[in-house]
């Protein structure tokens, strides 16, 4: 080291510190996901970020990393009205250019989304910006099978998260913004707690020109897709053709191609008229990762600069399907195929070809509704010879007629229109959501335009409207009484289980139990029991004072000698336990807390009465864990073994937390 200049030595030291911080923190910002409370149910896999494999060097090529993740970001962003540039920048910031343990195999979590994914979760150290300072915490994060699921899940969060009125991340949608800067501004303080989050994302987007991956909000492919050296394929009407600017090193058919900066697996395969699966198989590509200078085998491919007239039936199929809506294309033979274009989605393709989403997904084994430009999909099975346009026209007329005439007989069907939901359809036909869901085997309340639903038992559209109006008039008052003395309340738009319970002075558990609520799901117009018997007609008058009484902010003693505390908004199990100098285990045990879930207004025991408390043995010695300490460190400092500390305190996966009291002597 003596031969290294002082400035260079300082630079090297700073780089080492930077890498250590990146490895020791899974992410900077954290996504707000409602189901994260479910994570503790799953047996956690303990991972310390400091034990990350040395893979930072593999990701140091920024262009290669961007090219890899852009393969996923671009089609997913287009299908969800999001900015691909913002999604890519988020992945860069949250994963530290793919160097964090969380973003690497086998976790593939690029965005730091907490909770569990299909039962898979991993606990990692993370930095949270709380109370104007950075705090190290160990949190549960989702584990994905690949980057594709990570991008899809992030898009789902941005499109569907709602805590009341409207969607929480609607400010990130292209249709609601003027540029990507509006989207990054919306993410700051919502998606991430870092106050400088927007600036970091904007800097990455401008530095690396990520806007080239964005497309207009309309879903038009114009200018969005880049291949090779920036050639634009978005403005071509023929999905099989390529830009003459796509460049490339391929000199003869069936030879090799040298990857350039900005290339992606999709871009290269598209420019040579082959599928992504072929390119991946021929070159043994893992996780869609390629890098500049890499030579790829292009078997049977054509020169990147040539036309696509020789690509055979595949390109022809793409052209025919792409023109389905504008001309009377050739008849579809058995197993007709369609080549996915930029901006396409599973719903759009199914709708264009007069088939259901389930059929398209089943015929092509589509996972998580993920399709990508250049992918060939089976859009017709059987011997039907009708053209795609004829099928579309017929479907459109059917939908129009259904909408106009409604259902007139028992067991009739209804075609879903754009913007409709399970609630609105059931309300339109005077049936319950449960009936509509049961009759049509609807999953996760998901329906889509063009889907045919059984609305048997419902009246015609006109009668349904009258019935709905009558229902609304009857339920105009917020709370009413039933003949049995039970007070009921009609849910309004934007309300939640907690909100209704709090407004009516009851607990969430009571509201859930009295109304058999599942997954905390309620909907506008639903009537809920908010008082069990002996209520008067003016239920709201007796309930409102209770709701308006402010929650106690200081612990109160109960008749049993227990000290209780009322949970405030934003508090967690750890926060309440830490505030009252008890362990999380004590708080959970005393209050029978499930899944670490507490809610504002809940009264929890924070100190047991003298008669019920269990004093520690006189010869036992306890120690309170401080921030940054580990099982080994605590055991070593008290002259005991790790096994003793673990056994005496029933420690799982070597996980301890600040404020926890541990027995260190028996």
UniProtKB/Swiss-Prot annotation:
GO molecular function, one term: amidase activity
Gene3D superfamilies: 1.10.530.10, DNA polymerase, domain 6, LysM domain
SUPFAM superfamilies: LysM domain (SSF54106)
Entry's Gene Ontology BP terms: cell wall organization; defense response to bacterium; division septum assembly; killing of cells of another organism
Gene Ontology CC entries for this record: extracellular region
Catalytic reactions of this protein: Hydrolysis of (1->4)-beta-linkages between N-acetylmuramic acid and N-acetyl-D-glucosamine residues in a peptidoglycan and between N-acetyl-D-glucosamine residues in chitodextrins
EC number: 3.2.1.17
PANTHER family: LYSM DOMAIN-CONTAINING GPI-ANCHORED PROTEIN 2, MEMBRANE-BOUND LYTIC MUREIN TRANSGLYCOSYLASE D
Family classification: Belongs to the glycosyl hydrolase 73 family.
Protein name: Muramidase-2
């Amino acid at each position: 080291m003596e031969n290294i200049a002082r400035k260079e030595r300082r630079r090297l030291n700073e780089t080492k510190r930077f890498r250590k911080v990146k490895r020791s923190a899974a992410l900077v910002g954290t996504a707000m996901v409602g189901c994260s409370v479910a994570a503790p149910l799953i047996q956690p896999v303990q991972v310390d970020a400091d034990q990350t494999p040395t893979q930072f060097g593999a990701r140091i090529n920024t262009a290669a990393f961007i090219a890899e993740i852009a393969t996923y970001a671009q089609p997913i962003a287009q299908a969800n009205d999001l900015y691909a540039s913002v999604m890519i920048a988020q992945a860069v910031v949250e994963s530290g250019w793919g160097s964090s343990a969380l973003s690497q195999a086998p976790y593939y979590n690029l965005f730091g989304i907490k909770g569990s994914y299909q039962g898979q979760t991993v606990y990692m150290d993370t930095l949270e910006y709380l109370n104007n300072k950075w705090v190290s915490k160990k949190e549960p994060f989702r584990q994905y099978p690949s980057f594709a699921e990570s991008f899809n899940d992030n898009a789902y969060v941005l499109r569907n998260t709602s805590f009341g009125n409207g969607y929480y991340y609607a400010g990130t949608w292209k249709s609601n913004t003027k540029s990507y800067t509006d989207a990054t501004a919306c993410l700051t303080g919502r998606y991430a707690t870092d106050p400088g989050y927007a600036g970091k994302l904007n800097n990455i987007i401008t530095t690396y020109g990520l806007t080239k991956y964005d497309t207009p909000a309309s879903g038009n492919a114009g200018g969005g897709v880049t291949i090779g050296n920036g050639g634009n394929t978005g403005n071509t009407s023929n999905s099989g053709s390529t830009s003459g600017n796509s460049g490339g090193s391929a000199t003869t058919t069936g030879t090799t191609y040298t990857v350039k900066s900005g290339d992606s697996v999709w871009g290269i395969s598209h420019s040579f008229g082959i599928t992504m699966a072929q390119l991946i198989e021929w070159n043994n590509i893992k996780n869609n990762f390629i890098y500049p200078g890499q030579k790829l085998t292009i078997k049977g491919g054509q020169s990147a600069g040539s036309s696509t007239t020789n690509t055979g039936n595949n390109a022809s199929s793409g052209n025919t399907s792409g023109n389905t809506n504008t001309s009377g294309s050739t008849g579809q033979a058995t197993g007709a195929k369609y080549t996915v274009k930029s901006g396409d989605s599973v719903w759009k393709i199914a709708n264009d070809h007069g088939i259901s989403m389930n059929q398209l997904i089943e015929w092509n084994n589509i996972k998580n509704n993920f399709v990508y430009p250049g992918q060939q999909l089976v859009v017709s099975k059987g011997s039907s010879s009708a053209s795609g346009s004829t099928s579309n026209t017929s479907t459109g007329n059917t939908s129009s007629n259904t909408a106009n005439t409604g259902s007139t007989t028992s067991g009739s069907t209804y075609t879903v229109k754009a913007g409709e939901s399970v609630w609105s359809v059931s309300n339109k036909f005077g049936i319950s959501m449960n009936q509509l869901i049961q009759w049509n085997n609807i999953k996760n309340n998901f329906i889509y335009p063009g889907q045919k639903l059984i609305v048997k038992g419902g009246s015609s559209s006109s009668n349904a409207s009258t019935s709905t109006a009558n229902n609304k008039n009857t339920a105009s008052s917020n709370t009413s009484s039933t003949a049995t003395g039970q007070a009921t309340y009609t849910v309004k738009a934007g309300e939640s289980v907690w909100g209704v319970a709090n407004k009516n002075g009851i607990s969430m558990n009571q509201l859930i139990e009295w109304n058999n609520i599942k997954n905390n799901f309620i909907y506008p117009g639903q009537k809920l029991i908010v008082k069990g018997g002996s209520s008067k007609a003016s239920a709201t008058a007796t309930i409102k004072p209770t709701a308006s009484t402010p929650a106690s902010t200081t612990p109160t003693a109960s008749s049993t000698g227990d000290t209780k505390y009322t949970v405030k908004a934003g508090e967690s199990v750890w926060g309440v336990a830490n505030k009252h100098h008890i362990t999380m285990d004590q708080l959970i045990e005393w209050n029978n807390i499930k899944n670490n879930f507490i809610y504002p207004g809940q009264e929890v025991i924070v100190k047991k009465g003298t008669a019920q408390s269990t004093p520690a043995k006189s010869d036992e010695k306890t120690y309170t864990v401080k921030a940054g300490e580990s099982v080994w460190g605590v055991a070593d400092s008290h002259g005991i073994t790790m096994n003793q500390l673990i056994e005496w305190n029933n420690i799982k996966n070597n996980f301890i937390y600040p404020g926890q009291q541990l027995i260190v002597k028996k």
